[in-house]
């Protein structure tokens, strides 16, 4: 399955990943990522050059966890810019749009996961087990 992302969404995800990993604009403050979320974001970052091909439910789940961590990072960054500057400050407004774009991708990848789970259940007659989540392939 393909998760389509536009230019703004990819930019927001990259920015959020860099903030979460301690690079870029957010270097001046700390946003704590759990080690699992950090590892998943590091693995996702090189794939953020275009649409994402997701072949298994297990892959969708780790991509969703990485994007969730990015969204949380962008939300914290947005809150910080609003509190330290002003809601109408340029950095606060820009961070709002970054957060919104990433949140839109999170909603789509979550919906994709629900559709994948439903399709697996229809085909196999049972909810997806961890093994099936890793081995049931979806076309790209």
Locate each region found by the language model.
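Positively charged, low-complexity terminal tracts
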Residues: 1-140
């Amino acid at each position: 399955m393909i998760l389509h992302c536009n230019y703004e969404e990819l930019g927001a995800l990259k920015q959020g990943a860099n903030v979460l990993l301690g690079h870029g604009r957010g270097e001046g403050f700390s946003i704590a990522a759990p080690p699992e979320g950090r590892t998943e974001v590091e693995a996702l970052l090189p794939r953020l050059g275009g649409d994402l091909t997701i072949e298994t439910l297990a892959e969708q789940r780790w991509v969703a966890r990485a994007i969730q961590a990015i969204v949380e990072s962008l939300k914290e960054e947005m809150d910080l810019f609003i509190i330290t500057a002003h809601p109408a400050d340029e950095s606060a407004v820009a961070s709002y749009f970054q957060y919104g774009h990433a949140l839109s991708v999170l909603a789509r990848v979550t919906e994709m996961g629900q559709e994948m789970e439903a399709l697996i259940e229809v085909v196999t007659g049972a909810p997806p087990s961890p093994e099936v989540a890793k081995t049931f392939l979806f076309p790209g």
